[in-house]
A protein has these predicted regions:
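Extended, charge-rich helix/loop segments that form flexible
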Residues: 85-98, 102, 106-115, 222-257
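Acidic, metal/cofactor-coordinating or nucleic-acid-engaging core segments within structured domains
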Residues: 48-52, 229-284
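Active-site periphery "cap/insert" segments of enzyme catalytic domains
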Residues: 2-4, 8-11, 20, 58-211, ...
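Short, flexible helix-coil linker/hinge segments at the edges of structured domains or between repeats
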Residues: 173-188, 219-235
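SIR2/sirtuin-family catalytic core signature
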Residues: 1-20, 25-35, 41-54, 194, ...
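Amphipathic alpha-helical scaffolding segments
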Residues: 25-34, 164, 220-225
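Patatin-like phospholipase A catalytic core
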Residues: 198-202, 208-233
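Short coil/turn segments at secondary-structure boundaries
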Residues: 23-24, 171, 215-217
Length: 402
Protein backbone atom coordinates (compact mmCIF):
# COMPACT_ATOMS: atom_id res chain seq x y z
CA UNK A 1 0.00 0.00 0.00
CA UNK A 2 1.21 3.50 -0.85
CA UNK A 3 2.71 5.45 2.07
CA UNK A 4 0.98 8.87 1.92
CA UNK A 5 3.48 10.44 4.32
CA UNK A 6 6.39 10.21 1.88
CA UNK A 7 6.67 11.61 -1.64
CA UNK A 8 9.00 10.69 -4.49
CA UNK A 9 9.38 12.97 -7.50
CA UNK A 10 10.51 11.13 -10.63
CA UNK A 11 11.65 13.21 -13.61
CA UNK A 12 11.98 11.20 -16.83
CA UNK A 13 14.07 12.32 -19.81
CA UNK A 14 14.71 11.05 -23.33
CA UNK A 15 17.47 8.65 -22.36
CA UNK A 16 15.02 6.55 -20.36
CA UNK A 17 13.07 5.73 -23.52
CA UNK A 18 16.02 4.86 -25.74
CA UNK A 19 16.41 1.42 -24.14
CA UNK A 20 12.77 0.68 -24.92
CA UNK A 21 13.03 1.65 -28.58
CA UNK A 22 12.73 5.40 -29.11
CA UNK A 23 15.46 6.20 -31.69
CA UNK A 24 18.49 8.21 -30.64
CA UNK A 25 18.93 11.65 -32.20
CA UNK A 26 20.73 10.53 -35.37
CA UNK A 27 18.27 7.73 -36.15
CA UNK A 28 15.32 9.88 -35.09
CA UNK A 29 16.39 12.59 -37.53
CA UNK A 30 16.74 10.05 -40.35
CA UNK A 31 13.25 8.67 -39.66
CA UNK A 32 11.83 12.19 -39.47
CA UNK A 33 13.32 13.13 -42.84
CA UNK A 34 11.83 10.02 -44.45
CA UNK A 35 8.42 11.07 -43.15
CA UNK A 36 8.84 14.58 -44.55
CA UNK A 37 9.76 13.21 -47.97
CA UNK A 38 6.65 11.01 -47.91
CA UNK A 39 4.41 13.94 -46.98
CA UNK A 40 2.77 15.05 -50.23
CA UNK A 41 1.66 18.45 -48.96
CA UNK A 42 5.09 19.14 -47.49
CA UNK A 43 6.67 18.42 -50.89
CA UNK A 44 4.14 20.37 -52.96
CA UNK A 45 4.22 23.44 -50.72
CA UNK A 46 8.02 23.65 -50.65
CA UNK A 47 8.23 22.44 -47.06
CA UNK A 48 10.90 19.82 -47.75
CA UNK A 49 12.99 22.43 -49.52
CA UNK A 50 12.55 24.80 -46.55
CA UNK A 51 13.61 22.07 -44.12
CA UNK A 52 16.75 21.29 -46.12
CA UNK A 53 17.66 24.96 -46.43
CA UNK A 54 17.32 25.60 -42.68
CA UNK A 55 19.23 22.45 -41.75
CA UNK A 56 22.05 23.14 -44.22
CA UNK A 57 22.30 26.76 -43.09
CA UNK A 58 22.58 25.69 -39.45
CA UNK A 59 25.18 23.02 -40.26
CA UNK A 60 27.36 25.65 -41.94
CA UNK A 61 26.78 28.00 -39.03
CA UNK A 62 27.95 25.41 -36.49
CA UNK A 63 31.09 24.73 -38.53
CA UNK A 64 33.06 21.80 -37.13
CA UNK A 65 30.03 20.63 -35.12
CA UNK A 66 27.32 20.10 -37.77
CA UNK A 67 25.52 17.61 -35.53
CA UNK A 68 24.44 20.57 -33.42
CA UNK A 69 21.89 21.30 -36.17
CA UNK A 70 19.55 18.74 -34.60
CA UNK A 71 15.83 18.55 -35.30
CA UNK A 72 14.78 20.70 -32.33
CA UNK A 73 16.91 23.59 -33.58
CA UNK A 74 15.65 23.08 -37.13
CA UNK A 75 12.04 23.14 -35.94
CA UNK A 76 12.64 26.23 -33.82
CA UNK A 77 14.19 28.04 -36.79
CA UNK A 78 11.33 27.11 -39.13
CA UNK A 79 8.71 28.18 -36.61
CA UNK A 80 10.33 31.50 -35.77
CA UNK A 81 11.04 32.36 -39.41
CA UNK A 82 7.40 31.70 -40.25
CA UNK A 83 6.31 33.77 -37.25
CA UNK A 84 8.47 36.71 -38.37
CA UNK A 85 5.94 37.66 -41.02
CA UNK A 86 4.70 41.21 -41.47
CA UNK A 87 1.10 41.41 -42.67
CA UNK A 88 0.18 44.56 -44.56
CA UNK A 89 -2.17 46.74 -42.55
CA UNK A 90 -1.63 44.88 -39.27
CA UNK A 91 -2.10 46.85 -36.07
CA UNK A 92 0.98 47.14 -33.79
CA UNK A 93 -0.22 44.26 -31.59
CA UNK A 94 0.22 41.89 -34.54
CA UNK A 95 3.43 43.34 -35.95
CA UNK A 96 6.56 41.37 -34.94
CA UNK A 97 8.42 43.86 -32.77
CA UNK A 98 11.85 42.72 -33.97
CA UNK A 99 10.94 42.79 -37.66
CA UNK A 100 12.62 46.15 -38.46
CA UNK A 101 15.84 44.90 -36.89
CA UNK A 102 15.79 41.27 -38.07
CA UNK A 103 14.13 41.35 -41.47
CA UNK A 104 14.32 37.76 -42.78
CA UNK A 105 16.61 37.46 -45.78
CA UNK A 106 15.50 34.35 -47.62
CA UNK A 107 13.41 33.47 -50.64
CA UNK A 108 11.18 30.91 -48.92
CA UNK A 109 7.46 31.49 -48.76
CA UNK A 110 5.71 31.59 -45.41
CA UNK A 111 3.59 28.66 -46.63
CA UNK A 112 6.69 26.50 -47.11
CA UNK A 113 8.10 27.31 -43.68
CA UNK A 114 4.82 26.50 -41.97
CA UNK A 115 4.37 23.31 -43.97
CA UNK A 116 7.82 22.11 -42.92
CA UNK A 117 7.22 22.88 -39.24
CA UNK A 118 3.77 21.27 -39.42
CA UNK A 119 5.16 18.14 -41.09
CA UNK A 120 7.94 17.88 -38.50
CA UNK A 121 5.46 17.85 -35.63
CA UNK A 122 3.36 15.22 -37.36
CA UNK A 123 6.45 13.09 -38.04
CA UNK A 124 7.77 13.37 -34.47
CA UNK A 125 4.39 12.34 -33.09
CA UNK A 126 4.13 9.40 -35.51
CA UNK A 127 7.64 8.10 -34.75
CA UNK A 128 7.01 8.25 -31.00
CA UNK A 129 3.61 6.59 -31.37
CA UNK A 130 4.91 3.79 -33.60
CA UNK A 131 7.92 3.16 -31.37
CA UNK A 132 5.67 2.96 -28.31
CA UNK A 133 3.95 -0.09 -29.79
CA UNK A 134 7.23 -1.96 -30.29
CA UNK A 135 9.17 -2.03 -27.02
CA UNK A 136 12.65 -3.50 -27.51
CA UNK A 137 12.79 -4.87 -23.97
CA UNK A 138 10.37 -6.32 -21.47
CA UNK A 139 8.49 -3.73 -19.45
CA UNK A 140 8.42 -6.03 -16.41
CA UNK A 141 11.44 -4.38 -14.71
CA UNK A 142 9.80 -0.98 -15.16
CA UNK A 143 6.57 -2.32 -13.68
CA UNK A 144 8.49 -3.68 -10.69
CA UNK A 145 10.27 -0.33 -10.26
CA UNK A 146 7.01 1.63 -10.14
CA UNK A 147 5.44 -0.92 -7.76
CA UNK A 148 8.49 -0.65 -5.51
CA UNK A 149 8.14 3.12 -5.34
CA UNK A 150 4.44 2.82 -4.53
CA UNK A 151 5.11 0.46 -1.64
CA UNK A 152 7.16 3.13 0.11
CA UNK A 153 5.78 6.49 -0.98
CA UNK A 154 3.55 8.46 -3.32
CA UNK A 155 5.42 8.53 -6.65
CA UNK A 156 4.72 11.53 -8.88
CA UNK A 157 6.21 10.90 -12.30
CA UNK A 158 6.81 13.84 -14.64
CA UNK A 159 8.10 12.90 -18.07
CA UNK A 160 9.34 15.00 -20.97
CA UNK A 161 8.86 12.03 -23.30
CA UNK A 162 5.95 11.57 -25.68
CA UNK A 163 5.91 7.75 -25.52
CA UNK A 164 3.71 5.73 -23.17
CA UNK A 165 6.10 3.08 -21.85
CA UNK A 166 5.42 4.11 -18.24
CA UNK A 167 1.64 3.90 -18.62
CA UNK A 168 2.02 0.57 -20.41
CA UNK A 169 4.13 -0.72 -17.52
CA UNK A 170 1.68 0.53 -14.90
CA UNK A 171 -1.77 1.41 -16.31
CA UNK A 172 -4.13 3.63 -14.39
CA UNK A 173 -1.78 6.24 -12.97
CA UNK A 174 -3.55 9.55 -12.40
CA UNK A 175 -3.07 12.10 -15.20
CA UNK A 176 -5.64 14.80 -14.44
CA UNK A 177 -7.72 13.91 -17.50
CA UNK A 178 -10.83 13.03 -15.51
CA UNK A 179 -13.68 14.64 -17.47
CA UNK A 180 -14.90 11.67 -19.51
CA UNK A 181 -16.39 12.14 -22.94
CA UNK A 182 -17.36 9.74 -25.70
CA UNK A 183 -13.96 8.65 -27.01
CA UNK A 184 -11.69 10.94 -24.99
CA UNK A 185 -11.11 12.58 -21.61
CA UNK A 186 -10.64 16.29 -20.91
CA UNK A 187 -8.22 17.73 -18.37
CA UNK A 188 -9.63 18.96 -15.08
CA UNK A 189 -7.25 21.35 -13.26
CA UNK A 190 -9.27 21.15 -10.02
CA UNK A 191 -8.89 17.37 -9.94
CA UNK A 192 -5.16 17.68 -10.63
CA UNK A 193 -4.73 19.65 -7.41
CA UNK A 194 -7.35 17.70 -5.44
CA UNK A 195 -5.60 14.39 -6.16
CA UNK A 196 -2.24 15.66 -4.94
CA UNK A 197 -1.55 12.62 -2.80
CA UNK A 198 -2.16 9.87 -5.36
CA UNK A 199 0.45 8.29 -7.67
CA UNK A 200 0.49 10.14 -10.97
CA UNK A 201 2.06 10.32 -14.42
CA UNK A 202 2.27 13.69 -16.14
CA UNK A 203 3.57 14.38 -19.66
CA UNK A 204 5.25 17.78 -19.44
CA UNK A 205 5.88 18.08 -23.18
CA UNK A 206 2.96 16.12 -24.60
CA UNK A 207 2.02 12.52 -25.21
CA UNK A 208 1.13 10.11 -28.00
CA UNK A 209 -2.28 10.05 -26.28
CA UNK A 210 -2.86 13.81 -26.67
CA UNK A 211 -4.99 15.23 -29.45
CA UNK A 212 -7.37 18.06 -30.31
CA UNK A 213 -11.02 16.98 -29.87
CA UNK A 214 -12.41 19.18 -32.62
CA UNK A 215 -14.76 18.09 -35.37
CA UNK A 216 -17.86 15.92 -35.11
CA UNK A 217 -20.42 16.89 -32.49
CA UNK A 218 -19.41 20.20 -30.85
CA UNK A 219 -18.46 19.91 -27.18
CA UNK A 220 -19.38 23.07 -25.20
CA UNK A 221 -16.51 22.37 -22.78
CA UNK A 222 -13.86 22.36 -25.52
CA UNK A 223 -12.24 25.66 -26.44
CA UNK A 224 -9.75 26.34 -29.22
CA UNK A 225 -6.44 24.74 -28.32
CA UNK A 226 -7.79 22.39 -25.64
CA UNK A 227 -6.13 18.99 -25.56
CA UNK A 228 -7.81 15.66 -24.82
CA UNK A 229 -6.50 12.26 -23.74
CA UNK A 230 -7.33 9.38 -26.09
CA UNK A 231 -6.82 5.88 -24.66
CA UNK A 232 -5.93 4.58 -28.11
CA UNK A 233 -2.72 5.83 -29.74
CA UNK A 234 -4.27 4.98 -33.10
CA UNK A 235 -7.17 7.32 -32.42
CA UNK A 236 -5.02 10.04 -30.87
CA UNK A 237 -2.80 10.36 -33.93
CA UNK A 238 -5.87 11.26 -35.99
CA UNK A 239 -6.22 14.38 -33.83
CA UNK A 240 -2.60 15.52 -33.71
CA UNK A 241 -3.52 18.71 -35.59
CA UNK A 242 -6.61 20.85 -35.49
CA UNK A 243 -5.95 23.12 -32.55
CA UNK A 244 -7.13 26.17 -34.43
CA UNK A 245 -5.23 29.36 -35.08
CA UNK A 246 -1.95 30.20 -33.39
CA UNK A 247 -1.78 31.83 -29.97
CA UNK A 248 -0.69 35.46 -29.95
CA UNK A 249 2.58 36.36 -28.22
CA UNK A 250 3.43 39.75 -26.77
CA UNK A 251 6.17 40.31 -29.35
CA UNK A 252 3.60 40.42 -32.16
CA UNK A 253 4.20 36.88 -33.40
CA UNK A 254 2.12 33.75 -32.99
CA UNK A 255 2.83 30.43 -31.33
CA UNK A 256 1.46 27.53 -33.36
CA UNK A 257 -0.62 25.15 -31.28
CA UNK A 258 0.46 21.52 -31.19
CA UNK A 259 -0.30 18.30 -29.32
CA UNK A 260 3.36 17.91 -28.41
CA UNK A 261 6.02 20.43 -27.46
CA UNK A 262 9.36 20.52 -29.24
CA UNK A 263 11.86 23.16 -30.26
CA UNK A 264 13.67 25.64 -28.05
CA UNK A 265 10.75 27.71 -26.72
CA UNK A 266 9.23 25.04 -24.50
CA UNK A 267 8.62 27.38 -21.58
CA UNK A 268 6.40 29.64 -23.70
CA UNK A 269 4.30 26.67 -24.76
CA UNK A 270 3.74 25.48 -21.20
CA UNK A 271 1.01 28.11 -20.80
CA UNK A 272 -1.36 25.72 -22.60
CA UNK A 273 -3.51 23.30 -20.57
CA UNK A 274 -2.64 20.80 -19.11
CA UNK A 275 0.97 22.00 -19.14
CA UNK A 276 0.22 25.10 -17.08
CA UNK A 277 -1.07 22.95 -14.22
CA UNK A 278 1.71 20.39 -14.59
CA UNK A 279 4.47 22.96 -14.48
CA UNK A 280 2.84 24.82 -11.60
CA UNK A 281 2.57 21.52 -9.76
CA UNK A 282 6.17 20.60 -10.48
CA UNK A 283 7.44 23.69 -8.67
CA UNK A 284 5.50 22.50 -5.62
CA UNK A 285 6.54 18.85 -6.06
CA UNK A 286 10.26 19.59 -5.82
CA UNK A 287 9.78 21.36 -2.51
CA UNK A 288 7.62 18.63 -0.98
CA UNK A 289 9.52 15.60 -2.29
CA UNK A 290 11.41 13.39 0.16
CA UNK A 291 13.42 11.94 -2.73
CA UNK A 292 14.06 13.03 -6.32
CA UNK A 293 14.91 10.51 -9.04
CA UNK A 294 16.08 11.82 -12.42
CA UNK A 295 16.00 9.18 -15.17
CA UNK A 296 17.74 9.56 -18.52
CA UNK A 297 17.72 13.35 -18.64
CA UNK A 298 20.58 15.17 -20.33
CA UNK A 299 19.57 18.23 -18.25
CA UNK A 300 19.08 20.29 -21.38
CA UNK A 301 15.70 21.74 -20.37
CA UNK A 302 16.73 24.78 -18.37
CA UNK A 303 13.24 25.44 -17.00
CA UNK A 304 13.24 21.99 -15.39
CA UNK A 305 16.76 22.42 -14.01
CA UNK A 306 15.57 25.58 -12.28
CA UNK A 307 12.89 23.58 -10.49
CA UNK A 308 15.34 20.89 -9.37
CA UNK A 309 17.74 23.52 -8.07
CA UNK A 310 15.11 24.71 -5.57
CA UNK A 311 15.16 21.35 -3.80
CA UNK A 312 18.91 20.96 -3.95
CA UNK A 313 19.59 24.37 -2.37
CA UNK A 314 17.75 23.51 0.84
CA UNK A 315 19.63 22.57 4.00
CA UNK A 316 19.89 19.66 4.09
CA UNK A 317 19.36 19.11 0.35
CA UNK A 318 16.62 16.77 -0.83
CA UNK A 319 18.23 13.39 -1.63
CA UNK A 320 18.64 12.81 -5.35
CA UNK A 321 19.32 9.82 -7.61
CA UNK A 322 20.57 10.59 -11.12
CA UNK A 323 20.46 7.77 -13.68
CA UNK A 324 22.41 8.35 -16.89
CA UNK A 325 24.73 6.57 -19.28
CA UNK A 326 28.46 6.95 -19.76
CA UNK A 327 30.76 4.77 -21.84
CA UNK A 328 31.39 1.42 -20.15
CA UNK A 329 29.32 2.68 -17.23
CA UNK A 330 32.42 4.48 -15.97
CA UNK A 331 31.66 7.99 -14.73
CA UNK A 332 35.07 8.38 -13.12
CA UNK A 333 36.82 7.82 -16.46
CA UNK A 334 34.42 10.20 -18.22
CA UNK A 335 35.28 12.93 -15.73
CA UNK A 336 38.95 12.75 -16.72
CA UNK A 337 37.99 14.53 -19.93
CA UNK A 338 36.39 17.92 -20.43
CA UNK A 339 33.18 18.72 -18.62
CA UNK A 340 30.07 18.61 -20.79
CA UNK A 341 26.85 20.62 -20.60
CA UNK A 342 25.37 17.64 -18.78
CA UNK A 343 28.07 17.33 -16.13
CA UNK A 344 28.18 21.11 -15.64
CA UNK A 345 24.42 21.06 -14.98
CA UNK A 346 24.94 18.21 -12.52
CA UNK A 347 27.32 20.42 -10.56
CA UNK A 348 25.43 23.72 -10.72
CA UNK A 349 21.75 22.70 -10.94
CA UNK A 350 21.71 19.36 -9.14
CA UNK A 351 24.44 20.48 -6.71
CA UNK A 352 26.34 17.19 -7.03
CA UNK A 353 30.02 18.05 -6.68
CA UNK A 354 31.24 15.34 -9.05
CA UNK A 355 34.62 17.06 -9.46
CA UNK A 356 35.43 16.75 -5.76
CA UNK A 357 37.21 13.40 -5.74
CA UNK A 358 37.51 13.48 -1.95
CA UNK A 359 33.73 13.42 -1.60
CA UNK A 360 32.84 11.10 -4.48
CA UNK A 361 32.79 7.37 -3.76
CA UNK A 362 33.12 5.32 -6.94
CA UNK A 363 32.37 1.64 -7.34
CA UNK A 364 30.88 0.76 -3.97
CA UNK A 365 28.24 -0.91 -6.13
CA UNK A 366 28.61 -1.62 -9.89
CA UNK A 367 27.89 1.52 -11.89
CA UNK A 368 27.28 3.72 -8.87
CA UNK A 369 29.00 6.86 -7.62
CA UNK A 370 27.89 8.34 -4.30
CA UNK A 371 28.38 11.71 -2.64
CA UNK A 372 27.01 11.30 0.88
CA UNK A 373 27.79 14.93 1.80
CA UNK A 374 25.46 16.07 -0.98
CA UNK A 375 22.97 13.24 -0.35
CA UNK A 376 23.32 12.29 -4.00
CA UNK A 377 24.08 9.22 -6.08
CA UNK A 378 24.72 8.71 -9.79
CA UNK A 379 24.17 5.55 -11.81
CA UNK A 380 26.23 5.42 -15.01
CA UNK A 381 25.16 2.25 -16.84
CA UNK A 382 21.84 3.38 -18.32
CA UNK A 383 18.21 3.17 -17.31
CA UNK A 384 17.41 -0.44 -18.21
CA UNK A 385 20.49 -1.70 -16.39
CA UNK A 386 19.41 0.37 -13.39
CA UNK A 387 15.98 -1.28 -13.43
CA UNK A 388 17.59 -4.71 -13.28
CA UNK A 389 19.57 -4.02 -10.10
CA UNK A 390 16.99 -3.12 -7.49
CA UNK A 391 19.12 -4.54 -4.65
CA UNK A 392 21.91 -2.00 -5.19
CA UNK A 393 19.36 0.78 -5.53
CA UNK A 394 17.93 -0.07 -2.10
CA UNK A 395 21.39 0.07 -0.51
CA UNK A 396 22.22 3.37 -2.20
CA UNK A 397 19.04 4.94 -0.78
CA UNK A 398 20.26 4.10 2.70
CA UNK A 399 23.65 5.68 2.01
CA UNK A 400 22.15 9.02 0.98
CA UNK A 401 19.60 8.89 3.83
CA UNK A 402 16.58 8.83 1.53
Amino acid sequence: MTNPSKRILVLVGAGASVDFGIPQTKDFTAALERELQDDQYCLESGGWEAYQWVKNTLEKYYGDEPWEAHFERVYHSLHELAAMKLIDGAVPKYKPVLYPFLKPEHALEDRALRAAAHAMLKAIYKIASTSSALSKHSLNPLTAFIKGLMENAVPRIYTTNYDDFFSQAYPGLFTGFTNKRDGYNLFNPKDYWAEWNVPGLFHLHGSVHFGFPLGGTPDPDVDIGDLAWYESREEAIKHVHGGGSGKARLDGTQLERSAIITGLDKLGRLQQSPYLSYYGGLTREVNEADLIIVLGSGLGDLHLNTCLLQARRTCPPTPIIYVGWWKDGDLREALRGDLTDQTIAMVHDLRIDICNRAQMQFGSYPGWAVNTNARAAIYAKGFYSFLQDSASFAQILKQIEA
